[in-house]
Design a protein with these regions (language model features):
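Short, acidic loop-to-helix structural element flanking the phosphoryl-transfer center
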Residues: 1-22, 29-34
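Charged phosphate-binding loop/patch that engages nucleotide di/tri-phosphates or the phosphate backbone
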Residues: 9-12, 50, 87-109
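A structural signal for isolated positions on well-ordered beta-strands in alpha/beta enzyme cores
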Residues: 19-21, 65, 82
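A short, structured active-site edge motif that brings together acidic residues
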Residues: 21-37, 41-60
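Conserved Lys-Pro-Asp/Glu-containing loop-to-beta segment of HAD-superfamily phosphomonoesterases
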Residues: 50-78
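Acidic, Mg2+-coordinating phosphoryl-transfer loop and its flanking beta/alpha structural elements
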Residues: 67-101
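Short catalytic/ligand-binding loop motif for oxyanion handling, primarily in non-cytosolic enzymes
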Residues: 20-22, 29-33, 61-62, 73-76, ...
Length: 109
């Protein structure tokens, strides 16, 4: 799987300024966990394994912000909800959009 353009630079800078966690609802496919962890370690080596949260449902996550490409993950989140634009979510317009990682950087850095 390819890394989204500018994601590594932006996440690295965010990590220097904020408490960043990568949350994945990967439990639906538990056999994918080792590959996901390996991929994250390879492409985001500046993140510590304690910053990775694998869960069955993202509604258990609390924080100030959540960036996600799936609207249903944002609906129950109590903080600010940011929808990362993807082909499968173009019909949703009730969340603030982040169209790319440069926009994420502009918002937070």
């Amino acid at each position: 799987m390819e890394v989204n353009e500018h994601s590594q630079e932006v996440v690295k800078k965010l990590n220097e300024k904020y408490d960043v966690f990568i949350v994945s609802s990967a439990m639906e496919f538990p056999n994918s966990l080792p590959e996901k962890l390996e991929w994250l370690g390879e492409h985001f080596p500046f993140l510590h394994w304690k910053q990775f949260v694998f869960c069955g449902n993202k509604k258990v996550v609390h924080g100030d912000y959540m960036i996600d490409d799936l609207p249903h993950n944002l609906e129950t989140f109590n903080g600010e909800k940011l929808l990362f634009t993807a082909p499968h979510n173009m019909q949703f317009n009730h969340f603030q959009r982040m169209n790319n990682w440069k926009e994420v950087g502009e918002k937070f850095l």
